[in-house]
Design a protein with these regions (language model features):
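Class I SAM-dependent methyltransferase SAM/SAH-binding core
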Residues: 10-56
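A short acidic, Gly/Pro-enriched loop at the edge of an enzyme's catalytic core
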Residues: 54-68
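A short beta-strand submotif of the Rossmann-like class I SAM-dependent methyltransferase core
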Residues: 66-72, 78
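A short glycine-rich, Lys/Arg-flanked "PGG" loop and its adjoining helix->strand segment in the class I
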Residues: 86-105
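Conserved beta-strand signature within the Rossmann-like core of class I S-adenosyl-L-methionine
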Residues: 106-113
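Short "lid" loop at the C-terminus of a central beta-strand within the Rossmann-like core
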Residues: 114-119
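Conserved Class I S-adenosyl-L-methionine
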Residues: 122-158
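C-terminal lobe and adjacent flexible extensions of AdoMet/dcAdoMet transferase-like proteins
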Residues: 149, 153-205
Length: 205
């Protein structure tokens, strides 16, 4: 019956989700990817195991209305060397290609990442990919600077802001109190994270 038809329902994918996939756009169908296998979470369609520093996102093209990455992108290396073959890869570029690939036309990328100039970026020894307020220029129009490195997608930056991670800067319009709190965080140096909200530019099917 129509009650079980999920073909037209919005689908969201959370990268590096652990056992608590995030769903910033409140999509009816929630999926996750984590490096660990066998994970489950209530209300989640599936948590698929994949190492996204090495592997493609294990979903078909244009499957998701939105993708999120909370404290994840900083773990993806910019360059990976294969000494045996004398070659190198660009895992960060590859990941951005994959995110764009699995998003539907006009799909949203929502990412929260430690800023390059804050101590929280460098505290964790697995943080290898510092993000700056100008990194977006490599993946978003008009510049698309990462084209020279093999980036095949195209995004439009809808929003970029600093935030304090424990104050979730979700896409929903915040109350005045939230705006004031975030302003105070910036003034006191506690806004350690950068929020991206991008739109995938691609032709309709």
């Amino acid at each position: 019956g129509t009650g079980s038809d999920t073909s037209t329902q919005r689908r969201h994918l959370d990268l590096g989700c652990g056992t608590r996939p995030r769903n910033p756009y409140a999509a009816p169908l929630l999926y996750g990817i984590d490096i660990r296998s066998g994970l489950q979470a209530p209300g989640v369609q599936a948590i698929v195991a994949a190492n996204l520093a090495l592997q493609a996102i294990p979903f078909a093209d244009a499957q998701f209305d939105s993708v999120s990455a909370y404290d994840f992108i900083e773990h993806i290396p910019r360059v990976a060397l294969d000494v045996a073959s004398g070659s190198s890869r660009l895992p960060f570029i590859e990941l951005m290609n994959e995110i764009w690939r699995v998003l539907k036309p006009d799909g949203r990328l929502y990412a929260v990442t430690p800023l390059f100039d804050h101590e929280k970026m460098w505290r964790d020894p697995t943080h290898v990919n510092p993000i700056t307020p100008k990194t977006w220029r490599y993946f978003c129009r008009p510049e698309l600077g990462a084209r020279m490195y093999g980036f095949k997608g195209e995004f439009e930056m809808l929003r970029q802001t600093r935030c304090r991670f424990k104050r979730d800067y979700e896409p929903a319009r915040p109350a005045l109190g939230g705006w004031l709190a975030r302003g105070a965080d910036r003034l006191t140096g506690q806004a350690a994270h950068l929020v991206w909200e991008w739109r995938a530019l691609k032709p309709p099917h």
